[in-house]
């Protein structure tokens, strides 16, 4: 039986019912709906709608229902109830009879679903924060094990300057640190209770909403009922957080897909996160990483879809807002799964140090060092830049590295170049010179690892 049938003389068309009902996805809010209902029952005692005995009877029945839901949440899907609120109320009435019909006094599904969704989001944020932190830890652990793994750094996907695999890991650690911070900020804004705002104008009962918020574990209660039942900013923020986080994971995946390719061959992925070809026996495909990269698009789509759903809605509640859940549920599930999978990839990764170093020594990645050397000799940087460009052209013509050019050849481009240039052009020197904060020198990378460990402690 629908919760709103009294106004209607005809039953809903079955096709409309299937189109309208949301239990198939909002059943995931069952625990939150029950918790919110327990809180509301306590509030109704304070305004003399329920006696203490009635409230205790309702709470006991709701607690029992919560245990059932936690044991088998998908059993809810066997019902033909319209939504999770209807299901909980109908089950409650089965347990306590007509007393269950009193629980919805002064409450609307509009403030009820807003409360359920915020409680669910709070729980999801706690899980996501843990997952982000676990991947941060995995990146720091991998960085610490690969401080001496020198590899090319890239701009425009062309070798630019030498870095280390540790420095690369720490770059993604910084991105994930920002992801964590965004989740924490989002939690601060959504941690306000909608319950007691009714359909749109507030409840007619003198409920102490701040006390109710405290019972439910919120920091405070919302301040405007019209805004409260219409507000889905927290959904947009979480989808934005997930979208940004997935962009970071997609870039992480793309880098490792390239590093794992035969063309780069900097790393080898574990058999545990790769698959083969049904035709080509030699193939070892980076499927885990490709799926992370591919799943980024569906999360971006969920954010865009929710933006478009909300952009034209008048105040207050509209049924369009039922579309807030499926995309959110899927996006956060996807983000969580990809965080876990990225950590699994790092667990078994093998860095091929000799090949990484060989690649770092190619591509004239020490050209900037030669330019800096000339500047130290008094040559203006723009002129030094031009001189080094000419020297690189000559090195390419001879098929040699810059440091392999004879001194006489180098001096054709600038007379200030002396024998002391060769130690400057050495690979380790290129790293050692990048000793400012955030740089790739061994000392700075070690310091960054230590700092990251402290932040994770």
UniProtKB/Swiss-Prot annotation:
One Pfam family from the record: Lyase_1
GO molecular function: argininosuccinate lyase activity
KW Amino-acid biosynthesis (keyword) present: yes
EC number: 4.3.2.1
Catalysed reactions, as listed in the record: 2-(N(omega)-L-arginino)succinate = fumarate + L-arginine
GO biological process: arginine biosynthetic process via ornithine; L-arginine biosynthetic process
Cellular component aspect of the GO annotation: cytosol
Subcellular location: Cytoplasm
Gene3D superfamilies: Fumarase/aspartase (C-terminal domain) (1.10.40.30), Fumarase/aspartase (Central domain) (1.20.200.10), Fumarase/aspartase (N-terminal domain) (1.10.275.10)
Pathway: Amino-acid biosynthesis; L-arginine biosynthesis; L-arginine from L-ornithine and carbamoyl phosphate: step 3/3
Keywords: Amino-acid biosynthesis, Arginine biosynthesis, Cytoplasm, Lyase
PROSITE patterns per record: FUMARATE_LYASES
Annotated SUPFAM superfamilies: L-aspartase-like
InterPro entries xrefs: Arg_succ_lyase_C, Argininosuccinate_lyase, Fumarase/histidase_N, Fumarate_lyase_CS, Fumarate_lyase_fam, Fumarate_lyase_N, L-Aspartase-like
Signal sequence extent: none
Family: Belongs to the lyase 1 family. Argininosuccinate lyase subfamily.
NCBIfam families the UniProt entry points to: argH (TIGR00838), PRK12308.1 (NF008964)
Listed HAMAP family: Arg_succ_lyase
The protein's name: Argininosuccinate lyase
Organism in which the protein naturally occurs: Pectobacterium atrosepticum (strain SCRI 1043 / ATCC BAA-672) (Erwinia carotovora subsp. atroseptica)
């Amino acid at each position: 039986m629908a919760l709103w049938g009294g106004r209607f003389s005809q039953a809903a068309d079955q096709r409309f019912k299937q189109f309208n009902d949301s239990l198939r996805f909002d059943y995931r809010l069952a625990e939150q709906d029950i918790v919110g209902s327990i809180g509301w029952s306590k509030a109704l005692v304070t305004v003399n709608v329920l006696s203490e005995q009635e409230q205790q009877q309702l709470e006991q029945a709701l607690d029992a229902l919560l245990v059932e839901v936690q044991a088998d949440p998908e059993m809810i899907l066997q019902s033909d109830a319209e939504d999770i609120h209807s299901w909980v109320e109908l089950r409650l009435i089965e347990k306590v009879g007509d007393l269950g019909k009193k629980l919805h006094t002064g409450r609307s599904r509009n403030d009820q679903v807003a409360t359920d969704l915020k409680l669910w989001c709070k729980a999801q944020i706690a899980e996501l924060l843990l997952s982000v932190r676990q991947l941060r830890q995995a990146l720091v652990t991998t960085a610490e094990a690969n401080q001496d793994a020198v590899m090319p750094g890239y701009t425009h996907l062309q070798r630019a300057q030498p870095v280390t695999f540790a420095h690369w890991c720490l770059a993604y650690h910084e991105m994930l640190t920002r992801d964590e911070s965004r989740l924490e900020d989002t939690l601060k804004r959504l941690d306000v209770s909608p319950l007691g705002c009714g359909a749109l104008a507030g409840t007619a009962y003198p409920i102490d909403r701040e006390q109710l918020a405290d019972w439910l574990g919120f920091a405070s209660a919302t301040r405007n009922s019209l805004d409260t039942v219409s507000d889905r900013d927290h959904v947009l923020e979480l989808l934005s957080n997930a979208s940004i986080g997935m962009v970071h994971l997609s870039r992480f995946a793309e880098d490792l897909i390239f590093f794992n390719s035969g063309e780069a061959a900097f790393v080898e992925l574990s058999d545990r996160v790769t698959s083969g070809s049904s035709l080509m026996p030699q193939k070892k495909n980076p499927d885990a990483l490709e799926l992370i990269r591919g799943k980024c698009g569906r999360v971006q789509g969920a954010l865009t879809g929710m933006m478009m759903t909300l952009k034209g809605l008048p105040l207050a509640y509209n049924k369009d807002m039922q579309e807030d859940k499926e995309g959110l549920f899927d996006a956060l599930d996807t983000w969580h799964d990809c965080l876990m999978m990225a950590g699994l990839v790092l667990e078994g990764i093998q860095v091929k140090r000799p090949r990484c170093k060989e690649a770092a020594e190619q591509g004239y990645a020490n050209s900037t060092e030669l330019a800096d050397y000339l500047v130290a000799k008094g040559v203006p940087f723009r002129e030094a830049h031009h001189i080094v460009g000419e020297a690189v052209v000559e090195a390419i013509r001879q098929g040699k590295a810059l440091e392999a050019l004879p001194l006489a050849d180098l001096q054709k481009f600038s007379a200030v170049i002396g024998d002391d240039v060769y130690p400057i052009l050495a690979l380790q020197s290129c790293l050692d010179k990048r000793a400012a904060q955030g740089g790739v020198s061994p000392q700075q990378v070690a310091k960054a690892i230590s700092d990251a460990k402290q932040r994770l402690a």
